Amino acid sequence: MIKGLYALPPDVGAYLARIGLAPEDFRRAMHLELPPSPTDYSIPHTKESLDLLVHAHLFHVPFENIDGYDLHREVSLEIPDIFDKIVTRRRGGYCFELNALFSALLEALGFSCYAVGQRVLREGSFPPVSHRVTVVTLP
């Protein structure tokens, strides 16, 4: 079980296609030469690359928390399960799902990143940690 929480996406190409960035489209958008093979996902680890990935993910994968209201469905935070939900079945997810899968994509692409818990602050309150965000360190 724990291993599934830190797995890489089963199919990086399918994930990139889900967010509208087939590998060749991504490389063209970044003005890079096309790779020698269709499974070469090497990209520069720059702010521009990261911005393109973040924008594509936000534009193509909606925030949704529908599964949390289904008493007969268990929400899994394992990467293969999240991948199936978001990439294969083309659904959205909530912050823990979206950020876990996006972090896994970034790691698969060679970015240095880690997860942290966050609070949603409202004036006059100090609530518990209830959200997951991804911190990316660029060279």
Regions found by a protein language model. Name each.
Residues I2-K3:
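Glycine-aromatic micro-motifs
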Residues A100-P139:
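Hydrophobic/aromatic-rich core segments of domains that either
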Residues Y6-R90:
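Secondary-structure boundary elements
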